[in-house]
């Protein structure tokens, strides 16, 4: 089991990944179960498959949905691996993995109703039962929620879904702080307090 499946307590319909020639009869239920698409978007895709406008094998269908920007590569990989439950946390659709650390993982995610892209920080389930970790996470959520500075990412939401603690924060595209420091060196103080 990989880091993502452990970290999100995957709910799959079976343990068997889809083979390259599995029909959409296998892929479409996973797509629906994943929650990535609204009901109307799912029906639109299903209709295109039935009409012959979309490919009939699972791999080709996934490729086409990526090409049409309806799925991300990360989402397609999870679905083809028969892990649809790992693509929704609360009201957030997971788009891609951004990174991981000792406390958990960070994903690029989109709020289903608000259509806002966020960085979704998820505490690893292995440590989310630890009272000290939960207390630390709750303190972090409260503190980040009170911060308002142009150089600090804002927190939008925090909750628990299926036992998974998460916080949704402002998504800032570009390199990480670690990457920035490695490539350009220390950041001048004037730029930090800017």
Q: What kind of feature is each model-predicted range?
A:
Residues 1-95:
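Short N-terminal regulatory/linker segments that flank and modulate the kinase catalytic core
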């Amino acid at each position: 089991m990989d880091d993502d499946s452990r970290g999100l307590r995957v709910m799959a319909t079976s343990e068997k990944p889809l083979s390259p020639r599995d029909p959409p009869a296998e892929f479409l239920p996973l797509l629906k179960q994943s929650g990535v698409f609204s009901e109307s978007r799912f029906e639109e895709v299903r209709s295109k498959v039935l009409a012959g406008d979309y490919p009939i094998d699972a791999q080709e269908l996934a490729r086409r949905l990526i090409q049409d920007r309806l799925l991300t590569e990360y989402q397609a990989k999870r679905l083809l691996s028969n892990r649809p439950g790992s693509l929704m946390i609360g009201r957030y659709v997971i788009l891609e993995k951004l990174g991981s650390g000792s406390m958990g993982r960070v994903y690029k995610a989109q709020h289903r109703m608000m259509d806002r892209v966020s960085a979704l920080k998820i505490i690893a389930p292995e440590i989310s039962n630890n009272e000290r970790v939960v207390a630390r996470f709750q303190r972090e959520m409260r503190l980040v929620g009170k911060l308002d500075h142009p150089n600090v990412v804002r927190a939008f939401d925090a909750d628990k879904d299926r036992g998974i603690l998460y916080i949704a924060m402002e998504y800032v595209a570009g390199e990480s702080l670690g990457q920035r420091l490695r490539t350009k060196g220390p950041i001048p103080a004037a730029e930090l307090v800017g």
